[in-house]
Amino acid sequence: YGDDPCTCFQLKGSDSYSASEREMNQKMHKAISIIQFKAEGQIIKRHPEFGLEKRNLLHHIDFERGVLELGGKEYKMLDMNFPTVDPKDPYAFTPEEADIMERLERAFMNCEKLQQHMKFLLAKGSLYKVYNNNLLYHGCVPLNKDGTFKEVEIYGKQYKGKALYDILDNYVRKGFVAVDKAEREKGRDMMWYIWLNENSPLFGKDKMATFERYFLAEKETHKEVKNPYYDMLENEEVL
């Protein structure tokens, strides 16, 4: 990123860093963020059933005018220096980005402690648990506005409530231990889905507005609307 100050990626609480450290951190932050948006775009293209096409935003940038089309409106981009983004194929990695991804994958796969931690989580963890007659669960139970369980499509089948937690937990484990390569890949992609999809119990908001918070000044674009579950959390009839 050369002389790019990467001001959209300024670190909070970075007073303890030298000017050169802050500059390097901001450039690294921007570089890996663009890689993230590209990688996510590739997953979305592989899985249109995830319903996340609206989160693919790189191809909605007008690179000549410096604006982003979002929700039928145009917004001025705060940063338009994207030397690694090809407007004709914005989600393709450059050779350097592909090399970074390969090295990161090798580092994760060969990190003994990380592998131990993941094995521990799979052995001891779960998305929900019944303990002392109490139901403990991560995040939220996706609900409709009327308080009923929301049906969610996972790889062509509908799930809701407990069944949704069960199938997501199942795919997380497949991502690590499935013998069939296709099922293992589906499990890995599902872990990303669980992290940021509006129908995921572990996220529970209509979008993860990372891109908008980086590149758009308008606060309206930063808003992340929570699932109705959070409005009904104290409603005894719903519970």
What residue ranges belong to the model's regions?
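Feature recognizes metal-dependent phosphohydrolase scaffolds
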Residues: 1-239
